[in-house]
């Protein structure tokens, strides 16, 4: 495995070091190449001359490291290296641990992976006599290899059919066995409890579920949306004549025929009927008081 060994041209302290010379003699093989660089363009030209799996850089101090290998420098240097290359930075003397930590962060931000500090804080051991050895790798894959094309995904098959959706909650049938309305009630029972009391509302909902009967509290259902209540089961349907047969669709998509009978009964002392409607159009009635009213049956 061919190795490229490089040093900084102006790093005079390194060249005077006997530790570096002995290290160079120890690791250098015949197929390895030794070179010096003074700028990024020099380093780019040196790396492009051959296919090097390992690039070892030797520096005398952390100050030299911070001066040369800035984030912008590392980004450019990252693009020069072959995929799968290993970068080893050897520092002779540790004069600033903060600069070394900043260099490690810049390696990660530049795209390198598996950044390790092999010496200097007792984390790992190394055969090198240098005080700090930092190792990093350039990924062996290209960024495009991890990209998934949208065309490869079967969007239609990944989205379940809306007909098979199960609605949240148990539905109005669960109200029959409950003592009182749910905390997040949206079927109207909570409002009915406030008006007529908990026990009376429970009985009304029992009758409502068992019989499915409903009565109008306004008598305006047949006139159209402009005259209908917000919870009217005929909301969205055109106006119709009293007594006309109207077909409503329930939650499952089936159709239930309901006869709308808006016949008026003469005014007399009768019970006042309060009615609450569900989203599916069913309604319940409760006797509240005595008064002169018109009874309207739906």
Swiss-Prot record:
Disulfide-bond pairs as recorded: none
Motif annotated as Cx2C motif 1, chain positions: 218-221
Region described as Linker: 143-162
Location of region: N-terminal SAM-like domain: 1-143
Chief place where the protein resides: cytoplasm
Residues annotated for [2Fe-2S] cluster binding in this entry: 175, 182, 185, 187
GO CC terms of this entry: mitochondrial intermembrane space
Short motif Cx2C motif 2, span: 229-232
Entry's Gene Ontology BP terms: iron-sulfur cluster assembly
Record-listed [4Fe-4S] cluster binding positions: 218, 221, 229, 232
Region Fe-S binding site B: start-end pairs: 218-232
Name the UniProt record assigns to this protein: Anamorsin homolog
Source organism of the structure: Cryptosporidium hominis
């Amino acid at each position: 495995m061919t190795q490229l060994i490089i040093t900084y041209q102006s790093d005079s302290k390194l060249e005077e070091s006997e530790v570096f010379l002995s290290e160079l003699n120890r690791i250098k093989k015949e197929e390895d190449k030794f070179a010096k660089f003074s700028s990024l363009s020099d380093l780019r030209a040196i790396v492009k001359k051959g296919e090097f799996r390992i690039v070892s850089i030797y520096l005398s101090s952390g100050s030299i490291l911070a001066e040369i290998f800035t984030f912008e420098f590392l980004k450019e240097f990252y693009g020069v290296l072959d995929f799968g290359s290993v970068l080893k930075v050897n520092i002779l003397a540790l004069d600033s641990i903060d600069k070394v930590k900043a260099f490690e962060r810049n390696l990660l931000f530049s795209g390198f992976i598996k950044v390790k500090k092999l010496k200097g804080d007792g984390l790992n051991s190394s055969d090198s006599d240098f005080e700090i050895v930092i190792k990093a790798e350039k990924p062996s894959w290209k960024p495009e290899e991890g990209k998934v094309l949208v065309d490869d995904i079967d969007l239609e098959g990944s989205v379940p059919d809306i007909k098979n959706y199960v609605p949240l909650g148990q539905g109005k049938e669960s109200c029959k066995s409950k003592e009182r309305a749910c905390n997040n009630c949206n079927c109207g029972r909570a409002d009915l409890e406030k008006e007529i009391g908990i026990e009376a509302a429970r009985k009304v909902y029992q009758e409502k579920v068992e019989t499915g009967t409903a009565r109008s509290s306004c008598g305006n259902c047949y006139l159209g949306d402009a005259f209908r209540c917000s919870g009217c089961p005929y909301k969205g349907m055109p106006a119709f004549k009293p007594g006309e047969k109207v077909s409503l669709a329930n939650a499952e998509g089936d159709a239930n025929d309901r006869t709308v009978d808006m016949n008026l009964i003469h005014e007399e002392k009768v019970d006042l009927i309060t009615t609450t409607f569900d989203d599916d159009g069913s309604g319940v009635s409760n006797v509240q008081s005595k008064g002169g009213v018109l009874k309207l049956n739906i």
